[in-house]
Amino acid sequence: DTIMRMINDIVEHAVGMAISEDVDAKDWAYTELNELLLPIIPLQPVRYTEDMKGMKKADLMQKLKEEAIKLYEAKEAEFPDLEKIRELERVVLLKAIDNRWTNHIDDMEQLRQGIGLQAYGQRDPLVEYKMSAYDMFDEMITGITEDTVRIMYHVRIEQPVEREPVVK
């Protein structure tokens, strides 16, 4: 499932950015981890507890992945029909791609127009353009993933309100 892979990617990225392999569990950067993860996946904030003593980075990553998947499965259970949530996933993903892609095209145009200034800095404009374009593309892909997962976790089903007919 695409959304499940995206969730795993987000957890891996957040843990990879915030947690060092060679640091003890009680000294991990929990604030940074929460700042990266919680705006996208609404888990409980991660804090050090005694049962985490001796925990490895991979263990934390696995624990957070399991919690995030469990939370998403609970969100799926809110939908009466599984096909409806799959359709919603497709629509949300397409909208995120469309939005990020149009922004990316605009950003690439601005990069193309401004890249000539790199020659003044004694740098090869073509090399700088390729490096910047790659970074921007990577940022776009990450943004698509984050937007899609954030929206899917925060989506709610609205039940149609049944009204009694007004007596004439």
Question: Can you annotate each of these PLM segments?
Answer:
Residues 1-168:
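Extended, charged helical/alpha-beta scaffold domains that provide interaction surfaces
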